[in-house]
């Protein structure tokens, strides 16, 4: 059966799952630098490409040049990322910081939003944002933090993307400020519809209202969605 075309589709702001979006959802597929370009994507399937902090030890200046080339090559690429900082992984933190700073500059130069992987480095990230003063918006994906952490990030102008595990008060704070997105990340059996259903119950609003608001936010946060066809 062909899925019903929704006026306000689900938006999966960050996914590593290979399936393409259908009539019910827009998907932002997160690709690493060495993964294939998304020329085959059509309709509601888009991509982000970035230098993940786990890869920082093997990155070079040439990696930055290749990243810029890939970001420019396809209009289906709507964001840079995932970039980020991770104090738990074994990659030297100094290299993570260097390449993250360079990705921030690149995102600003190309007018692309930045999708961020963040593990135990929130204070560093907040300081960097204050120092670098980027004009492109920053979205932290897979946010599971407490309301106090969410409040600090929201005060600093971040957007937060939530998966199947989230703190209900943190989601409510971000949603109330128009800075929440939802995602499936790397869980292939998880549907974006189920994440929306859980979030709508937590927020005490209808599924339709949630879809409408997050869809409108996505068109603003990811402006290349509009350049690729307007209303999906």
Residue ranges and their predicted role:
Residues 1-232:
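Mid-domain alpha/beta scaffold segments of enzyme catalytic cores
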């Amino acid at each position: 059966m062909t899925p019903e075309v929704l006026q306000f589709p689900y938006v999966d702001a960050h996914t590593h799952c290979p399936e393409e979006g259908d009539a019910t959802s827009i998907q932002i597929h997160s690709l690493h630098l060495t993964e294939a370009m998304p020329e085959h994507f059509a309709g509601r399937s888009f991509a982000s490409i970035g230098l993940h902090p786990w890869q920082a030890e093997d990155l070079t200046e040439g990696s930055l040049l290749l990243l810029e080339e890939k970001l420019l090559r396809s209009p289906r690429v709507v964001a840079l990322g995932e970039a980020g900082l991770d104090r738990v992984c074994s990659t030297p933190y100094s290299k993570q910081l260097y390449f993250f700073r360079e990705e921030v500059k690149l995102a600003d130069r190309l007018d692309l939003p930045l999708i961020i992987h963040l593990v135990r480095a929130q204070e560093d990230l907040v300081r960097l944002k204050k120092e670098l003063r980027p004009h492109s918006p920053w979205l932290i994906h897979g946010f599971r933090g407490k309301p106090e952490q969410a409040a600090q990030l929201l005060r600093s102008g971040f957007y937060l993307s939530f998966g199947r595990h989230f703190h209900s008060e943190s989601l409510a704070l971000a949603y109330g400020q128009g800075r929440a997105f939802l995602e499936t990340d790397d869980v292939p059996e998880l549907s974006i519809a189920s994440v929306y259903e859980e979030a709508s119950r937590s927020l005490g609003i209808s599924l339709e209202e949630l879809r409408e608001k997050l869809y409108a936010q996505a068109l603003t946060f990811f402006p290349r969605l509009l350049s690729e066809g307007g209303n999906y």
